[in-house]
């Protein structure tokens, strides 16, 4: 395990060149198979998707019984199907996303106002922090019709600490996960810290949910809000769903942590790539100007008319998938794949990062070239296996429709209204390191100065 280094996805990619796209390795006592090609990924996630629909459960995920309630970790069964159905048909349906669009537009205006203020003061912006606040507010507006955080506030830092606390504990390697004999001793304190962070976040979410339930009881004739919380309260009352309040609070935790951490990380990578490539930045700005005209905040309906912006987001996802190994899967029974037996209980990791950097799939794989997606009809929605940052099959990320809108609209708002320069020009080295965790982010935060365009 120690030989994998701090960037296991890169180490696995190098090993796959020697041992092939389907290779096995022992991580402690945990037998693991690494998948590094689109063909093998399709076998695992599509052809044998039911066999590999299980999850290996990290010790941290046992906090507050999250593993027994979370849609992300529940086995495929009645409860999982009910939550999946709510996400697909109601929470993230096209109509639901359209209904909540104006709520998100208000939060984009707040980002614009904050960036304008920084521009007038001549101060740089920590893009990760600004993206985190905006993403969290976009999600809060969509989920709860409320604002969770504000720019430059103490409450924001506290909320950020909780979210990043949960994400870091879930994402950081824990020896007790690979040597089960250590679990009762919790040598790294992972379970103890996870209980604290999970408990704090679940407490906040339960408060929002219970407040809405009580409001609905006290005001049965009040008009419903265009947010996901109304959908969840309706689901609790519906006889065709067998869900309890805790199912919905843990679902919201998954959406908050998964959505905010991955979207924040990806926005930072997108802005880094554009600032480092002035000619690409100029192309995006020109396209946005031609479509948006005098509008300051992009409307989500404009997205189909912004192919180069879409290509930029895809190219960033190819180079920097936020979860490079996706969430681990587990074989629920013995299965032969490509002539190799994968025994029941095997952990399976899909190396999305390796596929995005494979020279047999991509020309100049390490270069930021959005133009490649103008000529190829490839998308990241789970059917093109060379580009699967959100996963694929029955375990594909349920929040992808919202994340897709967030990535495009935040990027458009920042790029259309401002020119950008590095706060410290000497900090233009893209290889200063990354931090591996729930999402792989830059080790050195991107700080850039907005200049009124």
Swiss-Prot record:
Pathway: Secondary metabolite biosynthesis; terpenoid biosynthesis. Heme binds at residue 397. Its main location: membrane. It catalyses: abieta-8,11,13-triene + reduced [NADPH--hemoprotein reductase] + O2 = ferruginol + oxidized [NADPH--hemoprotein reductase] + H2O + H(+); ferruginol + reduced [NADPH--hemoprotein reductase] + O2 = 11-hydroxyferruginol + oxidized [NADPH--hemoprotein reductase] + H2O + H(+); miltiradiene + 2 reduced [NADPH--hemoprotein reductase] + 2 O2 = 11-oxomiltiradiene + 2 oxidized [NADPH--hemoprotein reductase] + 3 H2O + 2 H(+). It is an enzyme of class 1 (oxidoreductase). It comes from the Eukaryota. The keyword Iron applies. GO terms for molecular function: heme binding; iron ion binding; oxidoreductase activity, acting on paired donors, with incorporation or reduction of molecular oxygen, reduced flavin or flavoprotein as one donor, and incorporation of one atom of oxygen. It is found in: Membrane. Monooxygenase involved in the biosynthesis of labdane-related diterpenes natural products. Catalyzes the oxidation of abietatriene to produce ferruginol. Ferruginol is an intermediate in the biosynthesis of carnosate, a potent antioxidant. May also convert miltiradiene into 11-oxomiltiradiene. This is Ferruginol synthase. It comes from Salvia pomifera (Apple sage). The lineage of its organism: Eukaryota, Viridiplantae, Streptophyta, Embryophyta, Tracheophyta. The gene is CYP76AH24.
